Amino acid sequence: MKSDIEIAQSVALQPITDIVKKVGIDGDDIELYGKYKAKLSFEKMKAVEANEPGKLLLVTAINPTPAGEGKSTMSIGLADALNQMGKKTMLALREPSLGPVMGIKGGAAGGGYAQVLPMEDINLHFTGDMHAITTANNALSALIDNHLQQGNDLGIDPRRIIWKRVLDLNDRALRQVIVGLGSPVNGVPREDGFDITVASEIMAILCLATDLKDLKKRLADIVVAYTYDRKPVYVRDLKVEGALTLILKDAIKPNLVQTIYGTPALIHGGPFANIAHGCNSVLATSTALRLADYTVTEAGFGADLGAEKFLNIKVPNLPKAPDAIVIVATLRALKMHGGVAKSDLAAENCEAVRLGFANLKRHVENMRQFKVPVVVAINEFVADTEAEIATLKALCEEIKVPVELASVWANGAEGGLALAKTVVRVIDQEAADYKRLYSDEDTLEEKVINIVTQIYGGKAVQFGPKAKTQLKQFTEFGWDKLPVCMAKTQYSFSDNPSLLGAPTDFDITIREFVPKTGAGFIVGLTGDVMTMPGLPKVPAAMAMDVAENGTALGLF
């Protein structure tokens, strides 16, 4: 089997102007970034707003292994299969962060024969969205420090600045830094730090904004610091929301590319699901819904993170809720949840599949709480045995959830046809009746307890001293009606990454809340979730190179 990049480079790409015609987009509706990439114009997005939205398919997964379970690959393969069936389909996915690409992943544009192209561009600088977000974020940091230096009219307490700088790389050495050292002309010395760009609130804002006006309003609503008397300081107090919007005026436009099979794909935005809401942009998803009969989108990590946030945070900003949810499961992950060591996952173990099924079962039950039909997709791997597959199918039948084996990595669209047919059948036979898990009127405490007990299966929530104080403060500031975005490990339902399967007798501890008032949610911090990742001992970057003719090498 060829590597992902070898497969990608063997494909004769079609001009993006030809690809977009499939969904009614003309050359005048796009802004080209070379022959194979483009951005969609504001005019076209506005023109299709009155269109009736098509069907929306949300792809999510069980709690993953460190290698991931193939949601992006499955999403791409499913969209290609639907198109092959004659259904006018678009993809709406996140764009990769350079940090994980250079770190552990090596690439994030699907895999095998289910990829979005040109994968080298998508994985590296793409159309510059990440750089624009990084620049806007760091411009705000510079403007805050300049305000301190120029007299500090707002009375900002330098010890209580919560806005950090960002970089689109994994760089643990920058997690905590001191700025303003050297002399009085270098600014006011203070503690600062760097997050990875995809953890920036500006990334979340870009992905939830519905147009430029909404983007500007959300940027103005960002809380950057507190005054000496503990009052919040907003971007609007600094009067720089216009400048930040200007930096982002092109980045807010969704990017158009293609799959190996020529399916049009909107790739836009990429917040992490363990520290943010983990979904691509509202603009991309909404526009795809109005251009195509079927839109396939994904939410990051397991359904306890990305899908929960998609359904509670993103859906209220979309023209409609999902018509079906596809939960991706792999036998290797189920065996890991069933107690098998990583080194033994290749060996057949039907009993471990039975034990690990508890994880998948809870995800199915959780998604059914939202009153949306669920389908299970088994992402096939070479090491899977017929006995293990039969075991998993039988277990799915016991809980009456449709299940299909999909081999899109190895076989592309053909490998996803059975899944696509089942998804279409389920949508035709069972209408979704979307129900949100909580109300905006619930308190922050009630929202957290609801997520922990109803989605994670936890027993109770423990609020640390700082979190308890913040619950009172945030209510006084009027932030208590915002949804909650939990920052939690992706590997477990709990806040302990080693507690696999479907644990029940556990508490979740909220140590702190972080206001993301521009994005429109409050983050609850659990465990030791990092907002600036580090690199592994052997980074993926060590396998990367470029040929003399400029061809990328080693992007997995």
Swiss-Prot record:
Pfam families listed in its UniProt record: FTHFS
GO molecular function, one term: ATP binding
Signal sequence coordinates: none
Catalytic activity: (6S)-5,6,7,8-tetrahydrofolate + formate + ATP = (6R)-10-formyltetrahydrofolate + ADP + phosphate
Superkingdom per UniProt: Bacteria
EC identifiers of the protein: 6.3.4.3
Binding residue positions for ATP: 65-72
Keywords of the record: ATP-binding, Ligase, Nucleotide-binding, One-carbon metabolism
Keyword Zinc: no
NCBIfam families: PRK13505.1
Protein family (similarity comment): Belongs to the formate--tetrahydrofolate ligase family.
Name assigned to this protein: Formate--tetrahydrofolate ligase 1
UniProt lineage: Bacteria, Bacillati, Bacillota, Bacilli, Lactobacillales
Originating gene: fhs1
